[in-house]
Structure formats: C-alpha cells, structure tokens
Amino acid sequence: MENTYHCYANRELSWLRFNERVLEEAEDSRLPLCERLSFLSIFQSNLDEFFMVRVGSLYDQTLLKNNKLDIVTHMTPSEQIAAITPRVAELQAKCDKYYQHLLSALKENKYIKVDFDHLDKQQEHYWKAYFTSEILPILSPQVVDQRHPFPFLRNKEIYLGVLLHEKHTSEHTLGIVPISSQMERMHFVRKDNETCFALTEELVLLSLIHISEPTRRVVIS
C-alpha cells in the first residue's frame, strides 16, 4: 500500500494554522479597534499555552530512548520541533507587525504609547518619580552567581534579564527582575485631549539603567 503519511497534517502545525487565523482577525480593519487588540492578546496567550503544554511535551519525548512517532504523519518529536520553530518565528514576526499597525491606529484615536527613548525633560522627570515611588519599592531583583542559583521562573510571568557589572572585579553577572502580576501592567496619563500609556516592563528597563548599587551597576537590559 502506498505511503499516505504526506496527505495528513501534523497536529501541532495544524494548531499553529488555527492560531494564525486568530491573529489575522487583529488585522481586519472592519472590526472595532479594541476587538482587534483583543485578538492579538488571544493569539499570544494561545501561543504561551502551546509552548507550555505541547512543545514542552515534545521536548520531554526527545529525552526518551525510543521516541514515539506521530501516529498520523510519522514525524519524530525532534522533527516536529524543527518544523514548529520557523513557523512560530514567522507568526511572531507577523504579530509584531500587526502590533505596530494597531499602535498607529491607537495614535490616530488619541491613545499614544510612551516612547521612553524620546522623552523630554518634563516627561523623564515624571516617569522617574513614578518609578521611584510606585514600582521600585515592590521590585525583587535577584542576582545569579555562585551563591545564588538560577531562580525558578513561573509560567506566564514577565521577567527582565539584565547584565550587571561588578565594580570590584570587573566581571559580569546576570540579574533577574520579576515583574510581579500584582503590579499594574499599564500606566495611563491624561494630557490635554490625549491619553498616554506606558508598559511597566519598559518603564523598569529605562529606570534600571540609571540605578547603581555600591558594588555593581546595570550595563545591559
């Protein structure tokens, strides 16, 4: 009997095609803007779940001596991972492009995302003060070194990685900064007839560069 494995779609790749259709809803200009943003969020949440459950399971299977083949397509776990990786990169690039389109659409409607690379003096002062009073007290940064092993990172949480320069030894160490789910993810500022909004992780990144401890300072974040 002729081999018909090529006639069938792999379950993981088929799921990615489904999630691509969710993503394409974010680019449909016929939909309300907030609904398009919601589809973008759903796409990303779906992808998180996909990696936690499906891709994680495939990686576990690669550790077994006798890898089970996919019943339908007869692909090994390693072959499935190799097929998934470029497909996800393609979808993520498309998601990033749609995100920029939606930011432009938001700007047309007087909702402007704060660009921390181009702040005037007044804006810089405001956000630094906000970080110092509202965010810094609840940050719990961790250093990874010989005395402190790499910490457990929880699923669906945001972490920032920073490179720290040790002043006494000139060596570099890794720092992990958890962005607690207890923090507000976004911060809004009303100005005239516009509303500016900032992401917490971007504000933390900006502020960490200007923080220097007695023994170390942030050089890359």
Residue spans for each PLM region:
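Divalent-cation
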Residues: Q146-P151, N155-E157, H187, N193, ...
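N-terminal-proximal low-complexity accessory segments that begin disordered
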Residues: H6-L47
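Extended, Lys/Arg-enriched charged tracts that mediate electrostatic binding to polyanionic substrates
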Residues: Q123-L174
